[in-house]
Amino acid sequence: MKIRPLHDRVIVKRKEAESKSAGGIVLTGSAAGKSTRGTVIAVGNGRILDNGNLKSLDVKVGDTVIFNEGYGAKVEKIDNEELLILTESDILAIVEE
């Protein structure tokens, strides 16, 4: 099944949270937390401005992004992967490695 976001929506596959602390301690359960990073797998056409023009999105497919925890809508598992639908404004940063 394919899913295509509309307008300024972005579909993100959440990256797994690190299971070790910086000091090498293995974290379990809630101590590991949920990552607020993910990989963009699809983007909408853009946001419609007040003047009617279409502004393309700054994020692209393949970008690693940081987003606010708790934002977005969870999508039923598609191809056995849990996905999130976010608006571009929910995304705080693009990670450049």
Curated annotation (Swiss-Prot):
Note the SUPFAM superfamilies from the entry.
Answer: GroES-like
Record has Lyase as a keyword: no
Annotated Gene3D superfamilies: GroES chaperonin
Q: Does the keyword Protein biosynthesis apply?
A: no
According to its UniProt entry, one GO biological process term is:
chaperone cofactor-dependent protein refolding
Protein's cellular compartments: Cytoplasm
Tree of life domain? Bacteria
Q: Name one GO molecular function term.
A: unfolded protein binding
Q: Which UniProt keywords apply?
A: Chaperone, Cytoplasm
PROSITE patterns linked = CHAPERONINS_CPN10 (PS00681)
Give GO cellular component annotations, separated by semicolons.
cytoplasm
Q: How does it assemble?
A: Heptamer of 7 subunits arranged in a ring. Interacts with the chaperonin GroEL.
Spell out the family assignment given in the record's similarity comment. Answer: Belongs to the GroES chaperonin family.
Q: What does this protein do?
A: Together with the chaperonin GroEL, plays an essential role in assisting protein folding. The GroEL-GroES system forms a nano-cage that allows encapsulation of the non-native substrate proteins and provides a physical environment optimized to promote and accelerate protein folding. GroES binds to the apical surface of the GroEL ring, thereby capping the opening of the GroEL channel.
Q: What is this protein called?
A: Co-chaperonin GroES
